[in-house]
Regions:
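Bacterial N-terminal signal peptides
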Residues: 10-22
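N-terminal cap/lid segment of alpha/beta-hydrolase-fold proteins
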Residues: 37-88
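Gly/Ser-rich "nucleophile elbow"/oxyanion-hole loop immediately N-terminal to the catalytic nucleophile
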Residues: 84-88, 145-190
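Short beta-strand element of the alpha/beta-hydrolase
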Residues: 87-98
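Cap/lid segment of the alpha/beta-hydrolase catalytic domain
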Residues: 103-105, 109-165, 216-231
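Primarily recognizes the serine-hydrolase "nucleophile elbow" in alpha/beta-hydrolase
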Residues: 168-240
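Short beta-strand/loop motif that positions the catalytic acidic residue
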Residues: 254, 260-262
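Catalytic cores of secreted or luminal carbohydrate-active enzymes
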Residues: 265-267, 271-302
Length: 302
């Protein structure tokens, strides 16, 4: 089963990035949520740090938090070591971790060895080794995900706002590189990273493929967090959270192929919500793989 999963994931991504699917068209202006997408499409200031073999440490700008600037740490990996751009351009992948995760160097390196330029960022305000960065954004925890706010503006202090912006900006960093084919960039995320992948796929129509693993939408209806978090909101807070932060509000606007992958008995993202997420995607773009025995975890090497 391990090899079957690998074949499904790699095959879908390769086909999409090689142009086997219809490419996305212009952005649907009617669904931008909390984000200034035009600003996120632009390359932010990047600090290029140590490079070791295929992998380089970088920092790029995040969204302001309570009036103060933030930055995002990431590993960027290239298929070939050295500063010179290759004669041909590479496809690229944005790699989005989940709860308890970090910027996984090995994940970026894995995709570089497959022939991609890849970026794996930290979405919990940390630097290398999960050490808290003084300029980092909000940490990933249940309280910051299910952020209780009494206005749309206040929701910008929550984790989802900052994490989605960081993922879209990571795409922009990749697209700015001379060795990257900006028309062949995809995104994949695991668990909460899959949740983010669903949102980003509905917002960032530059993407050519999206692969959320475990993560999905309709968390307000049936998920590990429904009773203890979503149902504790006031009706107004719940409406606001669903409208701005649940993937169900964005999946209908996906314009690239999207492959949903989950285990048959996932303990966090339940299959009924997973199925509804798949069904919300426009016809012809959604693909679904439910795997017996797939355990929940950061299984990026499978």
């Amino acid at each position: 089963m391990k090899s079957r999963f690998t074949s499904t994931l790699k095959g879908t991504i390769v086909c999409a990035l090689l142009g086997a699917f219809t490419p996305g068209v212009g952005r649907a202006a009617e669904r931008t949520g909390m984000w200034d997408l035009a600003a996120l499409d632009k390359t932010s200031k990047v600090q290029w740090d140590e490079r070791n073999g295929l992998v380089q440490e970088i920092y790029y700008a995040g969204e302001p938090l309570r009036g103060k600037p933030t930055r995002v740490f990431a590993y960027l990996a290239r298929p070939a070591a050295g500063p010179a751009a290759p004669a041909r351009k590479y496809p690229a992948m944005v790699l989005v971790h989940g709860g308890g995760g970090q910027a996984f160097k090995a994940w970026a390196e894995l995709w570089a060895k497959r022939g991609y330029v890849a970026i794996a960022m930290d979405l919990s305000g940390n630097g290398p080794g999960k050490v808290r960065d003084a300029g980092g954004g909000p940490p990933l925890n249940n309280e910051n995900v299910f952020f209780h706010a009494d206005s749309d503006e206040a929701m910008r202090d929550g984790w989802t706002y900052h994490a989605v912006a960081a993922v879209i900006r990571a795409h922009s960093v990749l697209a700015s590189l001379p060795e990257v084919d900006a028309d062949r960039i995809g995104v994949t995320g695991i668990s909460w990273g899959g949740y983010l992948t669903c949102i980003v796929a509905g917002l960032d129509h530059r993407l050519k493929v999206a692969v959320p693993v475990y993560g999905c939408g309709y968390l307000q209806e049936d998920s590990y967090w429904t009773k203890d978090f979503v149902d504790q909101m006031t009706p107004a807070q719940k409406e606001r959270w669903v409208r701005l932060c649940d993937p169900s509000s964005y999946l209908a606007h996906v314009q690239c192929p999207i492959l949903f992958i989950n285990g048959a008995n996932d303990p966090r993202f339940f299959l009924d919500s997973h199925r509804r997420s798949y069904e919300t995607v426009p016809p012809g773009l959604g693909h679904l793989a439910i795997l017996i025995g797939l355990k929940h975890g950061h299984n990026f090497a499978i």
